[in-house]
């Protein structure tokens, strides 16, 4: 029987928290659900996680890569691994275009 992986600890960047507060309650619920899935399994299929192009992360823990994940058809959030091992830093969230512009 495979060992169950521990969930990642979450680190929230200021811009993530500011943009999260601007979302409608239903949008916040979608982000909440997606973040829970990410914490438990960053490869969860519905998150459609992929690397952001031409963006460097702040933390070397994850190889300086930044990732984009889907919370819904129109909502995205960005993250990277770090700042410490076993942590995920949530960088930004919101509607598709603005979120990916301000990675």
What do these predicted regions represent?
Residues 1-36:
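Arg/Lys-rich, positively charged N-terminal/basic patches that mediate binding to nucleic acids
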Residues 4, 24, 33, 51, ...:
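Context-gated lysine
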Residues 28-43, 49, 84-85:
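A short beta-strand-loop micro-motif that forms or neighbors metal/cofactor-
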Residues 1-4, 18, 22, 64-103:
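Enriched for short, Lys/Arg-rich terminal
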Residues 14, 56, 103:
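Solvent-exposed, flexible loop/coil residues
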Residues 40-69:
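A short, surface-exposed loop/turn module that caps and links secondary-structure elements
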